[in-house]
Amino acid sequence: MVAKVLDGLAVSAGIFERLHRACCELENNGVCPKLATVLVGNNPASRSYVLSKHRDCKNIGIQSTLIELPANTSEKELISKVEILNASSDVSGIIVQLPLPESIDQNKVIEAINPDKDADGLHPLNLGYLVTGKQGIVPCTPAGIVKLLEAHRITLEGKTIAVIGRGTTVGRPLGILLSGKGVNATVINIHSRSRNISGLSRIADVVVACAGVKHIVEPSWIKPGAVVVDVGINQSGVSSSGKMILTGDVHPLTKNIASYISPVVGGVGPMTRAMLMSNVINLSERDFRKRLYAS
C-alpha cells in the first residue's frame, strides 16, 4: 500500500479563489484589506516565506507592505514599529515573521500586536478564545491542517490524533482545536519528555508531526492505514543546482504504511498561507462590520 497524497496545493487553490471573491466584495464596499509584515534580519528561509505571502496577497487582491529591519534591531524598536502599525487605520492585519533574533522576546512582541489585527492568531487573547471556544482568529497552521483533512473527507470526530510537538505556533493550539467541540477528536500531545513515544503514536488514527526534527517519525511509529500530516520543514543542505534541500519530520518510508500522507512541499505549507490570507480577509470584514454598526 502506498499512501495517497494530502494535496495542499489543490485545496488551497480553491480557498484562494473564494478569498479573491470576498476581497472584491469588500472593495465594492469601500474596504481595502491590507497586510503588514515585519521582517527582522536577513534569514533566507524567512525572506522566501515572507515574499510568498506577499505574492499570495497580490493574487487575491489584498494590499501588502513589508517593513524590513536589521538583525541588530532592539526589542523596544521592534515593538515601537508594531505599535505604529496598530495605530494605522489602513492596516487590516499584522504579522511579525518568526523566528526573531535571540535578543528579542518573541512573546512580548506578539503581545504588542493589537488582537484585532493579529493575522497569525498567536496573540494570547486569540489563543484564549480558542481555548474557550469563542469565535476568533485561529493560528494559521492548525487551521490549515484541519481544512486539509476535511477537504480529503477524513473524519476527525471520535478519532485518536497524536500531535508530536508542543510549540506555541502549531502543536499546542492544534491540540486545542482538534479536541474542541467543532472537531471532537481525542488528542494525545507527544513531546520530548513523553514516555513510550512510538507506542503512543502507534495507537493514533491520525499522526501530526510538528516537532521540527528531521525524520523523527519512523515507519514503526505508524499503525497501518493511519493518516500522517508532516508539518516539519528542515533544511538539509543544498543541491548541486543550488536549491535548498528540505526534509520533513516524517521518514519517507512511512508512505508505505499510511493511508494518506502530506508531502513536505505542497502539503501543509500552502494551507498555512491560505489560512493567513483568510485571517486577513476575516479581520477586514470584522472591522467593516464594526464601522457599519458604529455609523
From Swiss-Prot:
- GO molecular function annotations of the record: methenyltetrahydrofolate cyclohydrolase activity; methylenetetrahydrofolate dehydrogenase (NADP+) activity
This enzyme's EC code(s): 1.5.1.5, 3.5.4.9
**Record has NADP as a keyword:** yes
Entries under SUPFAM superfamilies matching the protein: Aminoacid dehydrogenase-like, N-terminal domain, NAD(P)-binding Rossmann-fold domains
* Superkingdom, taxonomy of origin: Bacteria
Membrane-spanning residues: none
Q: Which family does it belong to?
A: Belongs to the tetrahydrofolate dehydrogenase/cyclohydrolase family.
Q: How does it assemble?
A: Homodimer.
Instruction: Return the protein name.
Output: Bifunctional protein FolD
Q: Which organism is it from?
A: Tropheryma whipplei (strain Twist)
Which gene produces this protein?
folD
